[in-house]
């Protein structure tokens, strides 16, 4: 009697799964194989997809090899021009316009390796999208589809005539025919959709699949009239104190003020914990900084408790921290749910190196909060436009800049650059500085500040781009509301669109981390 067959020797494994960061290089290689005449994804594009909408990025893996993939984002399609381009709908491929509350999934690419195009890989990827649309209760899936065989007929018929013949099955088009077979219906034909697509003569068919399981919400989720975020900026006075408890009392007072105003964020200045030097009685600046690092746990414990107690997210200024024998200038985000994040200062001023021996960090971070994505760029860092652009591309809508400057010239560098970053990146920026003086403390003798909240410059925002600002050089707070929904709409339809209109064909910023 023959032995029972070992069926595992015959098995082949096909998996449709979400894309992970380890797959990115393989996805780029796959695109080169699928579309040899078109510019492939850049790594930063695919990383941005995973940061903004990881659930919408799928790949087909066969025997350990990635042989197909698809990418998508969520939008409210009513907010876009019918004659949009691929660049418009994807924010130049970065999908930073992804709207988690959107009613429509927009598919921006599907590709299958040429060797595997008889295995219904495209159909499987489309089904994964449809399953996700049902799970998220989306109204429809919309795609801008290529018509890659049109160039063969372009001299004898218009794009509309070609599409009509494909729809009537008189001409076969590998993309449009496939989409029709998968339940998509034609909405319109868009010219100049994808400049690199010479096979389609730059045309695309706008197609839609309607989710028959969609349940309309009682509220009109597709139109969000406002997304207000209230920010309380503390312009903190540096004056002599006699204990950490006295410092804690002052801090709690301001957090209480922010909470009473129902603020979403309370923002403290850079290295305002150097106020502790006033009772440490250490004359050497470098030794005084080392003494301050001994209060790191007390500082973190204090702000964590206050964020939870007063139900407000706190940008805890910044604090000197010793790690592995080096001292860093670190800004902390204390979320009101009790979690903590940190951002190292990346650019160290000559003064910080000379007096305190501060070391530089090496990562630009963007943090999720209950009020959207934010970034923190400490003082000098806001003077380097590359960092703000990287943060904006990672999805940040607000950049907080705690600062500490001793004179008006230093302050104006921070202010002017902060306002410039707001315009360049169509984001809100916030600066919070120290005032007063510490006469017996080396290198912290005098302070100058006028803190503020800044917006882009367009009709939807404050006339002069200033949401609110303090009076110069006195201890006080300023409280202002910023609207992330207005910001989102302005990025799509503003008088100018700095993010969309970048010339990526002649320059780009590469983040090396």
From Swiss-Prot:
SUPFAM superfamilies: Acyl-CoA N-acyltransferases (Nat), Carbon-nitrogen hydrolase. Disruption phenotype: No visible growth phenotype. Residues 14-212 form the N-acetyltransferase domain. This is Probable hydrolase YhcX. It comes from the Bacteria. The keyword Hydrolase applies. GO terms for molecular function: acyltransferase activity, transferring groups other than amino-acyl groups; hydrolase activity. The keyword Hydrolase applies. Its EC number is 3.5.-.-. It comes from Bacillus subtilis (strain 168). Keywords: Hydrolase. It is an enzyme of class 3 (hydrolase). InterPro entries: Acyl_CoA_acyltransferase, C-N_Hydrolase, C-N_Hydrolase_sf, GNAT_dom, UPF0012_CS. It holds the Pfam family CN_hydrolase.
């Amino acid at each position: 009697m023959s032995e029972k067959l070992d069926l595992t020797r015959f098995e082949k494994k096909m998996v449709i799964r979400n894309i992970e960061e380890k797959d990115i290089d393989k996805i780029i290689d796959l695109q080169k194989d699928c579309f040899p005449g078109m510019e492939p994804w850049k790594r930063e594009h695919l990383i941005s997809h995973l940061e903004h909408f990881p659930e919408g990025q799928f790949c087909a893996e066969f025997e350990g090899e990635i042989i197909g993939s698809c990418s998508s984002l969520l939008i409210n399609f009513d907010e876009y021009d019918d004659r949009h381009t691929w660049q418009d709908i994807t924010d130049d491929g970065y999908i930073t316009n992804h709207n988690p509350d959107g009613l429509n999934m927009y598919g921006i690419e599907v590709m299958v390796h040429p060797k595997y195009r008889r295995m219904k890989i495209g159909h499987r990827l489309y089904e994964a999208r449809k399953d996700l649309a049902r799970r998220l209760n989306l109204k429809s899936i919309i795609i801008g589809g290529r018509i890659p065989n049109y160039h063969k007929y372009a001299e004898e018929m218009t794009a509309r005539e070609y599409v009509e013949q494909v729809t009537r099955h008189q001409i076969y088009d590998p993309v449009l025919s496939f989409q029709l077979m998968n339940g998509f219906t034609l909405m319109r034909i868009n010219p100049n959709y994808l400049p690199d697509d010479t096979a389609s003569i730059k045309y695309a068919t706008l197609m839609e699949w309607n989710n028959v399981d969609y349940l309309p919400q009682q509220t009109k989720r597709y139109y969000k009239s406002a997304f207000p975020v209230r920010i309380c900026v503390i312009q903190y006075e540096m004056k002599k104190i006699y204990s950490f408890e006295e410092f804690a009392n002052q801090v709690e007072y301001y957090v209480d003020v922010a909470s009473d105003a129902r603020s979403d964020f309370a923002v403290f200045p850079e290295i305002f914990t150097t106020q502790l030097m006033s009772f440490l009685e250490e004359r050497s600046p470098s030794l005084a900084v080392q003494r301050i690092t001994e209060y790191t746990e007390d500082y973190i414990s204090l702000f964590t408790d206050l964020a939870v107690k007063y139900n407000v997210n706190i940008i805890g200024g910044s604090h000197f921290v010793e790690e592995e024998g080096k001292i860093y200038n670190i800004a902390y985000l204390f979320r009101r749910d009790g979690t903590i994040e940190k951002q190292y200062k990346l650019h160290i001023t000559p003064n910080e190196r000379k007096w305190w021996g501060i070391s530089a960090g090496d990562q630009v971070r963007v943090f999720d909060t209950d009020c959207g994505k934010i970034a923190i760029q400490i003082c000098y860092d806001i003077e380097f436009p590359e960092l703000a652009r990287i943060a904006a591309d990672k999805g940040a809508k607000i950049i907080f800049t705690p600062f500490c400057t001793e004179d008006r010239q230093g302050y104006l560098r921070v202010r002017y650059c902060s306002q410039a970053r707001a315009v360049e990146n169509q984001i809100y920026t916030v600066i919070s500085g120290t005032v007063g003086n510490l006469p017996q403390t080396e290198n912290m003798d005098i302070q100058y500040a006028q803190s503020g909240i800044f917006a882009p410059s367009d009709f939807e925002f404050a006339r002069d781009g200033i949401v609110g600002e303090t009076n110069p050089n006195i201890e006080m707070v300023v409280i202002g509301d910023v609207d992330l929904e207005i910001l989102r709409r302005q990025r799509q339809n503003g008088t100018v669109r700095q993010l969309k209109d970048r010339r990526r064909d002649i320059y780009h910023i590469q983040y090396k981390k």
